[in-house]
Amino acid sequence: MRFAAAALLAWAGLSAALPAQPNIYAGTKVFRVPTGNQNQTDSIGRMIESLNLPTWTKARMAFSHIDVQVSKDRLNAFHAALKSVDSNLDNQVVTMHEDLGASILKEAEGMNSASVDPFAGLATDAWFNSYHSYADHLTFLNDLVATFPNNAKIVTSGTSYQGRTITGINIFGSSGSGTKPAIVFHGTVHAREWIATMVTEQVAYSLLSNYTTSATIKSYVDKYDFYIFPVVNPDGFVYTQTSDRLWRKNRQPTTSASCVGRDVNRNWAFKWDTPGGASAGDAPENKGLAAFLNARSSSAAGAKLFIDFHAYGLLFMGPYGYSCSAKAADQTEHNRLEQGFAAAFKAPYGKTLTTGPICTTIYQATGNSVDYAYDVSKFKYSFTPELRGSSSGNGFVLPPAEIRPSGIEVYEGIKYLLANMS
């Protein structure tokens, strides 16, 4: 494929920049801290906050866990604080990353040794052996179109703050593009969640590569228009590959020089709150993404399904996130599909998903894409998964060996939805 032809040059530049990333986190550890009853859970949370430690996940409930990142200069204080909460707690902590910088470097080595495909311009599943640069992701989408020209074309959904086009692929069937109800997939709105990029691309590749060989897949592609955007936060994604592997937000300045970026998934103009930016929908990425969703729902073909892919946590959730008491108008139907997706997802590798509304399943989240797509854009179904990284203990820095299994289990879940949506 063309990405391979350009890879030697692209990766030469990228690999030159990558060593700066592990140096940021050299000696940093990531721990999983088990929590007991609610009082202990709250105490651990306050302790972590007092030390100003970044958390990868928070305890969703009592008798859960908190994944926390601890730099080497805070290690002694962290262990002492654990003992102050409970004298036995320090012995129960699990180390997720002994040296986060080394883990990031290992992940980057996998990228730099990506397989070279001799078939220039053709998309193959060798792509899913490793992670890739942003430039190569764009090339891969173009390779998909070149490989499957009768069923795919490039689409865009606005631009980022730094001027990058938000690029996706439209997959369509025998009736042509734009004639069937829309299914829209977003990936990597949180820049550090690289697995979301690969999984959305694997779903796209699977739909296209099976169109002519599977009557079932052909029926799905003929029935719906798929719009798949693997990277909806391109500025943040590029920043994770050049400066800080664990960056989450976009790169839009704020009024504070020390606080850069909007959380694009708290910026949607529905039940928005101040942590999502200066005003609702003020991130350029959101403006373009919202306009694209609204255009699909206002078209004659209509809007069927929206999914915003995230990592990590092994969850599959629907509306609402803004309130734990609000219920979707078709809550029972959403619940049914969530549970069916989870069963299909579990079949290949035994990974169990927790399902339910966002707010009651993980935490309250205002200004999120799922609520917007469901309540404003009027997509019939709206979901968000949290993918792998929890049970393996790798979190956001997921080894390349987990890419393909992640895509396979998600694809099984997607096929369930396509077969069972009303």
Show where each model-derived region lies.
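M14 metallocarboxypeptidase catalytic domain recognition
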Residues: 2-6, 11-422
